[in-house]
Each structure stands twice: as structure tokens, then as C-alpha cells.
């Protein structure tokens, strides 16, 4: 005994030293090795049990429990049966005797070890494990401890974190399911007992959802005073229920009384904070109570639960409800159960949105503000689950008043205290509107009756959403939203808020077009009048102009009006899609009114150029004015598809005046803004409008308009006042498309191709003049680089924009570009050492190959490829690839992309290049990337290999799939076998690498090759590679290195095994198991026997899961056996 006490003191000293801030890492390693050595000795668990029982040092207790945890989870098979029995007896006794004294995290760790033993031994060797837990739950003084054990049992036995055999996992789940009725009954009893004990008045059932006043009366039945011990107990019970509900199926065990109990506690979250006099504690103090987390802490009798702790009970109760709501698979006989849940929730929603509370001092918003934030989030989650998962089940039930529910949801939504809460509720409305739209499309016959049922609610929703985006009504709240920092979607907080709001407006528009238009247009008109009236306040003074609005109140009003006009213009643009297609004629007048107004506003902005006017508070008003002008152009651009349809209609009519006026005025609005001195936001909006007119609308007369001619002159003649690059590219694209794209509704003979071709050639000649005149050899001056990069950027964009167009457009484009392409090819070798320039050149050539390779012709294409192949030597490739993320690496990627395009060309055109491309791929690129981390280049190289195999299968296999099947096993005609084998080896090697993206990509490539070309059935693959691939994929599953791809890997395994199931089960499987280290013959036989020779995918997948899981389990068991153990 004395030696054990001495050991304990020494251990405590060591543990204290280990965690001391002054202890060096080297010393910590020494201590760790010393402890691990001692813990690993056979029978050392007795010492650790003594340490655990007799020490109050938390470090010692935690380490002791870690030793036991490791013993149970990793070495249990090798522990002697009498030692196991002693541990099963000692540890629970220790827990019962000391649980009240232990810190809660130590107590929980001890509970976890006991549950781990139960997971291994219950019921065969530890038959009273679960019954002991249930007895604790039923004991008034030990119920909390029992609930901690019960929750851990649910967590650890249903979803075991350590390896168990599949049979054991199934057994445990079945054993627990058998106990669920008893468990739920006990938990119901706990909740009911506490509720009944603390209820102030007699509780009545939930009201009918249609009763508006009963919800108020029921508020009195919620216990406002709850002692801390009861609160902690209920919190643990609800935590247990939440976890149980996450995995048990819906069944009759979830009784109405259990549901009612949960909803009783959900009411706690609805309570307002109140001032109550705390009950005196045993020592005479008064203190607010708190519920211990995770069942921790100890509650003194008489301590009461405060508002925050009551809210935690409400949150946990909502957690339970949401776990039930998540279950999409609802048996038919559970419709009544669901209805009961929704009636209870309806009641809670009434309480949350009730303005007649007993204090009569709270607005709904302030009530929600006072509630626990987590409770409101959980309640919103519930509403989302109800609408998205169960609305279709409950809508037609006469006992559930959906319209009244929507009225309450409306109040709940528009009284949210936070922007995030409001947006979460808007998401619920979006789901509801999608549901309604789908329902109407499937029931067109009674469309009107469905819409009329919800019409008033939707119009109300529309008005309120529009109100919420207006600064004149909500300036202080909207100013809180950040409009500068971009999120992962490249949106600011304000932009996200506005976008989500406008999506709701658009969904209402789809259902109620005329009502939406009549609500939106007057609001827009009001702000437009303010904007259009600004001209009268402009005062001229010599050459300068000033906006004569200076009073602070007037500036604030103007700021709000301009922000709102900007938002409403975006709303008008978002609705453009609802005026085209089949409804074009029916809604023509409304759309025409909108477009005319947008043209008027755009012209007005361009004529008086308010961005150029001096004003008070320019830092606020100038961005507002620029934004309104930009948004008017963007909204007009959104109607380009409507204008295109209008263009098609007027082609068939004599009178085109209206259409011509709209286009002429639009261009008059855009043209003055295409100037380097204009603010960039405005400039880009004008450029995008020009592109849409040229690309989408395509009026015949567009190019002849004076405003457009001015733009041509600016771009082709005025090289000294160049636009910013992005704007320059957009304008060049628009001008090019005006000349290249066919005019709609006109026959080929009236397209004026010769004239347009000549004009396009002149345009390109002007754009590329400096580029074509670059000196050779180049002077490598930075201006030369700038000319190359800027010119090729423009040309690449022009080619890309017509890549999907008709042959004539592409022919004209290539004819104009021909000289520039020749220049680019001549310059390429001269800049091979400058990756920034080479990257731009290869980007240009890649776009050319993708869009114009037919027009370029075979000979010239082959010349380009041969030039590239000769330039990219092994050394050049190595330099580029090894600088990961650099321009050099990008150059290699672009080169491989170009080769991908080439090898995908059908026919025999580029087949002579295949040997060179394969050699580059396998002999030059692959050796460099095989052992290095260069994922981008590696991904492109495997994509190229795949395309070579996929698009040029007969380069390797002369026979077709059909003839090879008909030959039924005869000799296959194969060529280039060495390259094919090398390619397959490269794919196989990639499955041994940690890169999960390459693994997924390459696995899908093999699957495509098998689907299209029967890769796995080919004789060479079947005989020499198939089992190697299966072995590698199984080993990957065993090592859990790519668990995210488990389903993909299993599907590939199935397709490979399906080549010859008989050989897989009779030959491969025994061979695979014989090669697996760490198994005995009996285990190998068991594994093979349990993998039943099924041939359907679900059964095969289950077999793969089982063999992988059980193999890992056996290895774990065998690794834990003491040396020299006789394995039977």
C-alpha cells in the first residue's frame, strides 16, 4: 500500500510538472514516454484504478481514465476475463460512490469508459449494463447520473466511434431499439412529474389553432418558478430525447403525452424575462440559479432557474421537435401525429407574436428581442422544416388553418430583431412560394382558386418586403448593413439582403404579375420624380455646375430617395423575365411603359451628368447619383431579351418607329458615358448595355446610328485616350459582334456579309496595328509586353464571344484575325522565357483552338502544335511545373488544355500528332508530376490522357465494342500496347496519392472509359490490371484515407468485379485476404464467408462495407492481444 501511495505522489508530481508552463517540450516528451511505458505494462490497470480512486488531482484522474479508455477500445480482446469482470464491477461502484465529488468532466469521462465496456460486453458478459442505467434514471437522487449514462449509451452504441464488427453494430442497434419504449416512457414520466410539480395553474390542452384568444390565457399555466435541480434534470432528459430522436424511427413509442411534455418545455423559450424574488438557499443566501452544462455541476436545493436557464430548456425542447421534423419518411398513420405537432407549434407561434401580453408593454419585435437568440433560431429552423418538408402533407387537412398560419408567420418574419433572422424567414417564404408555384403548375385547372386563397397574403408580403428595402422607411436599420466587405459569393451584406428580398418579389411576380406591377410601379414613380426633378436645382456658375440642395434634412431625404431608387431599379430589372416568351403580347403595354421610363431616366442621367456636378456632402450623394445612373442602364440591359422579341415582332410589321426610338435613345444614353473620364461603375454599365444591344437585340440599323459611329471612331482612331482594359474589351466585343452576328429574322441574302466582313477586317486591323508592328526580335521593353497582353486579351474575348455562332460569323472572324495569328506564332518562341507573356499567348491560342480550329485548317493547326511541342522541352516543362501557382505552371496547364482540344477533334485530322502528344504526356510531363505536389498540372495531364483514350480508342483497340463482344474471347486486335499500359499505370499510381480531387477525377475517368468502351472487359486490362485496381481501391477503403469517396470507390469496385463475379469471389477474394497482414486463418474464412456472392449493387456495396469494417476490427483485436496468445 505504501508503495502505491508513493507511486501516486510521484505521478501527481509528474503530471503537475507536465502541465506547468515552464516545462520544456523535451521534458514533456520524456514524461510522456515514461507514462506510456508504465500504462502499457500487463496488469497495470490495477495501479491506475488505485490512482483514480485515491487521487484528487484532475490531471491524474483524466490520464487514468484515458488509460482505461485505451484499454477498453484498443486492447479489450486481450484482457483476461476475470480482469474484465473486475473492471465491470469496480468502475460503476467508483462512479456511484464518488460522482457527487468529481468535477463533471471527470465524471463524464468515467461514464464514457463504463459505456465503452457496455458496448463491448452487453448483454452477453455485462447483462445488467442497461438495466443498471434504467434503475439510476428511476432513482430520485441518481436520476441525473442515469441520464448522463443514457445519453452516452445512445451516442456510443448507435454511432460507435471505434471499430466494431458489422454484426456487433447491428446487434447493438437492435438491442437498443428493443429498449426504446421503456426509455421513452421513463423520460416522459420525468418531464411530466417536474411539470406537474411546478405548474401554477391547471394546464389545459393546446387551443384550436383557429382560436385567437386562447393562446393568451394559456400563458399562465407555464411555471414561472422552477428549482435548479429540476431544471437540470429536465435539460438532461431533453438532451437524451434529442439524441434518441436523431436515430429512432417514428413509431407509436413517441406518444402524445411525450409530445405534450416536450412542448410544455418549449414554452419556456417564449417567456419574457421577469423579476422574481429568488427562493432562499439552505444557507440563507439568495442567488439566481443556473443549469449546469452537460449534466455538470451540482444544484443546491432551493436555488431557482433564471431566465437564461429557462431559455436553455426551451432551446433543447425545440431541438427535440426539430429532430422529429427532420424525418421526411413519415408513415401514413402518423398524419395525425404531425397535425398534433403543428397545432402545438401554432400555439407557440401565437405566443411569440401575441401583442396582448399580460404586461401589455411589449411590441412583438421587443418581445422577440428579449428572447434567447438560440431559441428564436431553433424556432425559425422549425418553421423552415415545416414549410419545406411537411407543408404538402398538412395543407389539405381541414383542421390546420394554413392562411392563419401564414398570417402569424408574416408577423414573426417582419418583427425579427436581427437582419440574419429576417433573411432566414425570407428563405422560408421563398420555399413556400416555390411550393405554391409548383402546385399551380401541376394543377392548372384550379389555378385561380389556389391563387385566390393566398392572394391577400402574398400582396401583403410583397408590400412589406418592398418597404423593408427602402431607406426612407428604415434608414437606421439599413445603414447598419455593411456595403463594402465582400463575402465568399463576392457580395456585400447589403447586396445579399437586397438580392434575397428581390428574389421574394420575383417569386410573387410569377404568381401575381399584375398585382406586383401595380404595387411596384407607383413606389418607383415616387422616387423617379425626385430624381428627375433634380435638374431644377442645378445652378451654373461660369463653367462649373452646382446642386443647390444644402440643408441637412434635404440632403438626407435625397440620399434615401436615391438609395431607394437604385434598389427599385434593380427590382424592375429582376422582373424583366416575366414579360418575355408566351406572355409577351399580353403584358406588352406594361413592359413598354417600363422600358420607355428606363430609357428616359438613362438619357436624363447622361444629359445632365450629375456625377460631374458639385454638391454638398459629395462623399454620400455623388456615389448615390452614380449608382442610380448605373442601375438605370443595368435595368435597361435586363430588358434586352424583351427588346429582342420586340425586334422580331416589328420585323413583321410596317411601323417600327417605337422600336427604333427605344434603341436610338438607349444608344444616345450609353454613348457619352463610354469615355475614360467617366466613373468606372457608370462606364462599365454603359459598356454592358452596348454589348447586350449588339449581341442579344441585334437591330439591323444599330451600326449606322451616329452614337454607335462615335464609339467606333473612339476605339479605332483615338489611341491616346484609351479606355480602362475591362471597358475596352467590352466595347471591342460589342463592335465586333455588330459586324459578325447574323441579324435575326432576315434571310441570308439580306445579311450584307461582304460589307460587314470588310468593316470587321478594318476594325481588327486598327485594334492590332501596334501589335502587328512589334519589332522582331523584340526589345523586351515593358511597353511591348503591355501591347501583347492588351491586344491578345481583346482578340481572345472577340473569338470567345462568337465560339457558338454560325459558320459564317466564324469565317469572317478568322479572316480578320489571320495576320495577327501568324504574328502570334512568330512571336511565341521569342517570348518562351517570359511566362507572363507566354501565358497570354497560349490563352489566345487555346480560345482559337476551341472556337476556330475548323477555320484555321489542318496544316496551320499542325504547324502550331509542332511549334509548341518543339518549344516545350523537358527542361522547360520542369521549370514551369515546379513553380507551383506561378505563371510558368499556368503556361504548362494552358498547353495541356490546347492538346486536350486537339485530341478531341473527330476524324483522322490530327491522328498523326497522337504519338508525339502521348510521348510528351507520359515521358516528359508525368515523370515530373508523379512524385511532386503540383495538383493543377497533374489534373490537366490526366484530363489529356483521358481524352486521348476516350476520343481515340481505336488508336489502341482496332475493333469496335460490338465486334469485340461478338468475338467472345477471341484475340483482340491491339496496337500501341506499351503506351496504353503506361497510361493505366499512371492512373493506378494516382490512387496511391493523398490528393482526393485527383483521385475522384481519375476514378470517374476510368468509369467513363468502362461505360463507353468496356475498359474493364478488355483482355489486357482484365488479365493484367483488373485485380491490381480492385486491390488498390480496397486498400484505400481499409486505410480510410479517402472516406469522402466511399460511394464512388464502391461503385467502381462493383463495376470491376462485374466483369467476372465468379472469379472475383472464388479467386480474387481469397487471394486478397491471404495477402492481408494481421489476420488468422479463421478470421480470413469468416470474412470470405460473410461477403455473400451477391451480384446486385446494394448487396455488393453492403458486402464491401462489411469486409472492410470487419477486417479493420480483426486487426485491432489481434493487435491488442498479449504476445504469445494462442488464436483459435
Swiss-Prot record:
Keyword set includes Nucleus: yes
- Tell me where it mainly resides: nucleus
Q: Which Gene3D superfamilies match?
A: Leucine-rich Repeat Variant (1.25.10.10)
What SUPFAM superfamilies does the record point to? ARM repeat
Q: Which GO terms describe its biological process?
A: protein export from nucleus
Q: SMART domains attached here?
A: IBN_N
State the name under which the record lists this protein: Exportin-6
Q: Which organism is it from?
A: Danio rerio (Zebrafish)
Amino acid at each position: 500500500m505504501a508503495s502505491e501511495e508513493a507511486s501516486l505522489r510521484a505521478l501527481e508530481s509528474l503530471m503537475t510538472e507536465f502541465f506547468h508552463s515552464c516545462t520544456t517540450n523535451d521534458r514533456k516528451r520524456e514524461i510522456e514516454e515514461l507514462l506510456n511505458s508504465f500504462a502499457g505494462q500487463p496488469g497495470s490497470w490495477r495501479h491506475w484504478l488505485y490512482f483514480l480512486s485515491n487521487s484528487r488531482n484532475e490531471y491524474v484522474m483524466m490520464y487514468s481514465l484515458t488509460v482505461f479508455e485505451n484499454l477498453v477500445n484498443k486492447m479489450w480482446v486481450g484482457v483476461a476475463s476475470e480482469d474484465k469482470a473486475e473492471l465491470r464491477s469496480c468502475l460503476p461502484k467508483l462512479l456511484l460512490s464518488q460522482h457527487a465529488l468529481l468535477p463533471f468532466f471527470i465524471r463524464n469521462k468515467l461514464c464514457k469508459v463504463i459505456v465503452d465496456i457496455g458496448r463491448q460486453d452487453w448483454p452477453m458478459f455485462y447483462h445488467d449494463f442497461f438495466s443498471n442505467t434504467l434503475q439510476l434514471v428511476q432513482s430520485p437522487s441518481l436520476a441525473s447520473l442515469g441520464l448522463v449514462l443514457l445519453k452516452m449509451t445512445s451516442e456510443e452504441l448507435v454511432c460507435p466511434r471505434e471499430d466494431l464488427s458489422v454484426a456487433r453494430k447491428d446487434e447493438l442497434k437492435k438491442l437498443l431499439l428493443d429498449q426504446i419504449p421503456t426509455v421513452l416512457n421513463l423520460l416522459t414520466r420525468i418531464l411530466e412529474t417536474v411539470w406537474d410539480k411546478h405548474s401554477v395553474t391547471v394546464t389545459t390542452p393546446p387551443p384550436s389553432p383557429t382560436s385567437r384568444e386562447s393562446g393568451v390565457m394559456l400563458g399562465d399555466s407555464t411555471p414561472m418558478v422552477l428549482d435548479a435541480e429540476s431544471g437540470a434534470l429536465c435539460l438532461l432528459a431533453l438532451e437524451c430525447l434529442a439524441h434518441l430522436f436523431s436515430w429512432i424511427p417514428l413509431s407509436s413509442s413517441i406518444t402524445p403525452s411525450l409530445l405534450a411534455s416536450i412542448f410544455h418545455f418549449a414554452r419556456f423559450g417564449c417567456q419574457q424575462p421577469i423579476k422574481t424574488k429568488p427562493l432562499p438557499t439552505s444557507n440563507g443566501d439568495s442567488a439566481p440559479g443556473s443549469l449546469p452544462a452537460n449534466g455538470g455541476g451540482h444544484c443546491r436545493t432551493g436555488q431557482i432557474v433564471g431566465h437564461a436557464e429557462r431559455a436553455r430548456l426551451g432551446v433543447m425542447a425545440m431541438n427535440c421537435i426539430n429532430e422529429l421534423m427532420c424525418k421526411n419518411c413519415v408513415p401514413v398513420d402518423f398524419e395525425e401525429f404531425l397535425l398534433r405537432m403543428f397545432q402545438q407549434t401554432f400555439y407557440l407561434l401565437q405566443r411569440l407574436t401575441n401583442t396582448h401580453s399580460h404586461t401589455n408593454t411589449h411590441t412583438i419585435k421587443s418581445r422577440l428581442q428579449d428572447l434567447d437568440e438560440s431559441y428564436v433560431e431553433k424556432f425559425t429552423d422549425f418553421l423552415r422544416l415545416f414549410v419545406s418538408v411537411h407543408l404538402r402533407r398538412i395543407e389539405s387537412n381541414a383542421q390546420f388553418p394554413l392562411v392563419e398560419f401564414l398570417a402569424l408567420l408574416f408577423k414573426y418574419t417582419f418583427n425579427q430583431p436581427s437582419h440574419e433572422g429576417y433573411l432566414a424567414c425570407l428563405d422560408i417564404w421563398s420555399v413556400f412560394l416555390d411550393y405554391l408555384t409548383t402546385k399551380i403548375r401541376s394543377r392548372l385547372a384550379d389555378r385561380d382558386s389556389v391563387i385566390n386563397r393566398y392572394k391577400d397574403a402574398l400582396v401583403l408580403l410583397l408590400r412589406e418586403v418592398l418597404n423593408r428595402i427602402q431607406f426612407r422607411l428604415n434608414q437606421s436599420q439599413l445603414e447598419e448593413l455593411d456595403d463594402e466587405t465582400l463575402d465568399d459569393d463576392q457580395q456585400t451584406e447589403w447586396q445579399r439582403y437586397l438580392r434575397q428580398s428581390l428574389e421574394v418579389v420575383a417569386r410573387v411576380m410569377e404568381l401575381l404579375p399584375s398585382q406586383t406591377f401595380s404595387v411596384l410601379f407607383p413606389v418607383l414613380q415616387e422616387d423617379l420624380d425626385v430624381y428627375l426633378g433634380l435638374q431644377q436645382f442645378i445652378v451654373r456658375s461660369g463653367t462649373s455646375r452646382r446642386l443647390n440642395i444644402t440643408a441637412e434634412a434635404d440632403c438626407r431625404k435625397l440620399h434615401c430617395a436615391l438609395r431607394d431608387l437604385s434598389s427599385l431599379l434593380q427590382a424592375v430589372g429582376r422582373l424583366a423575365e416575366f414579360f418575355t416568351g408566351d406572355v409577351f403580347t399580353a403584358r406588352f403595354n406594361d413592359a413598354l411603359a417600363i422600358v420607355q421610363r428606363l430609357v428616359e431616366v438613362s438619357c436624363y442621367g447622361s444629359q445632365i451628368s450629375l456625377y460631374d456636378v458639385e454638391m454638398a456632402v459629395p462623399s454620400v450623394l455623388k456615389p448615390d447619383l452614380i449608382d442610380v445612373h448605373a442601375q438605370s442602364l443595368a435595368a435597361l440591359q435586363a430588358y434586352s431579351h424583351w427588346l429582342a422579341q420586340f425586334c422580331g415582332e416589328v420585323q413583321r410589321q410596317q411601323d417600327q418607329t417605337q422600336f427604333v426610338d427605344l434603341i436610338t435613345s438607349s444608344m444616345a444614353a450609353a454613348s457619352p458615358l463610354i469615355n475614360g473620364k467617366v466613373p468606372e461603375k457608370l462606364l462599365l454599365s454603359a459598356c454592358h448595355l452596348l454589348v447586350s444591344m449588339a449581341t442579344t437585340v441585334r437591330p439591323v440599323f444599330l451600326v449606322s446610328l451616329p452614337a454607335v459611329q462615335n464609339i467606333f471612331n473612339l476605339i479605332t482612331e483615338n489611341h491616346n485616350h484609351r479606355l480602362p482594359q475591362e471597358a475596352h474589351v467590352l466595347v471591342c466585343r460589342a463592335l465586333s459582334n455588330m459586324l459578325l452576328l447574323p441579324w435575326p429574322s432576315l434571310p441570308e441574302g439580306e445579311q450584307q456579309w461582304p460589307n460587314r466582313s470588310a468593316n470587321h477586317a478594318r476594325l481588327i486591323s486598327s485594334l492590332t496595328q501596334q501589335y502587328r508592328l512589334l519589332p522582331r526580335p523584340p526589345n523586351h521593353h515593358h511597353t511591348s509586353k503591355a501591347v501583347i497582353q492588351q491586344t491578345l486579351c481583346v482578340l481572345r474575348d472577340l473569338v470567345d464571344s462568337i465560339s457558338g455562332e454560325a459558320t459564317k460569323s466564324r469565317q469572317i472572324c478568322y479572316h480578320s484575325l489571320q495576320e495577327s495569328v501568324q504574328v502570334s506564332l512568330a512571336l511565341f518562341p521569342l517570348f518562351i522565357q517570359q511566362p507572363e507573356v507566354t501565358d497570354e499567348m497560349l490563352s489566345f491560342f487555346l480560345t482559337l483552338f476551341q472556337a476556330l480550329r475548323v477555320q484555321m485548317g489542318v496544316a496551320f493547326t499542325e504547324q502550331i502544335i509542332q511549334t509548341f511541342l518543339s518549344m516545350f522541352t523537358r527542361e522547360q516543362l520542369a521549370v514551369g511545373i515546379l513553380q507551383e501557382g506561378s505563371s510558368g505552371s499556368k503556361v504548362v496547364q494552358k498547353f495541356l488544355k490546347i492538346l486536350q482540344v486537339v485530341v478531341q477533334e473527330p476524324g483522322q485530322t490530327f491522328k498523326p500528332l497522337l504519338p508525339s502528344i502521348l510521348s510528351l504526356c507520359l515521358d516528359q510531363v508525368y515523370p515530373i508530376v508523379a512524385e511532386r505536389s503540383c495538383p493543377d498540372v497533374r489534373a490537366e495531364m490526366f484530363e489529356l490522357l483521358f481524352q486521348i483514350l476516350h476520343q481515340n480508342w481505336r488508336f489502341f483497340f482496332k475493333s469496335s465494342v460490338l465486334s469485340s463482344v461478338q468475338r467472345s474471347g477471341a484475340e483482340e486486335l491491339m496496337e500501341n500496347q506499351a503506351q496504353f499500359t503506361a497510361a493505366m499505370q499512371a492512373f493506378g499510381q494516382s490512387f496511391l496519392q493523398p490528393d482526393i480531387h485527383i483521385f475522384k477525377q481519375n476514378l470517374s475517368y476510368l468509369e467513363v472509359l468502362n461505360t463507353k468502351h468496356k475498359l474493364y472487359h478488355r483482355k489486357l486490362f482484365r488479365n493484367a490490371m483488373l485485380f491490381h485496381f480492385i486491390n488498390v481501391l480496397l486498400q484505400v477503403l481499409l486505410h480510410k484515407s479517402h472516406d469522402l469517396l466511399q460511394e464512388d470507390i464502391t461503385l467502381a469496385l462493383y463495376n470491376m468485379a462485374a466483369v467476372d463475379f465468379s472469379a472475383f469471389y472464388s479467386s480474387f477474394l481469397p487471394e486478397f485476404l491471404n495477402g492481408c497482414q494481421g489476420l488468422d486463418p479463421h478470421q480470413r474464412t469468416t470474412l470470405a464467408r460473410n461477403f455473400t456472392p451477391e451480384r446486385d449493387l446494394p448487396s455488393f456495396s453492403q458486402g464491401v462495407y462489411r469486409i472492410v469494417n470487419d477486417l479493420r476490427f480483426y486487426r485491432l483485436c489481434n493487435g491488442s492481444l498479449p504476445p504469445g496468445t494462442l488464436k483459435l
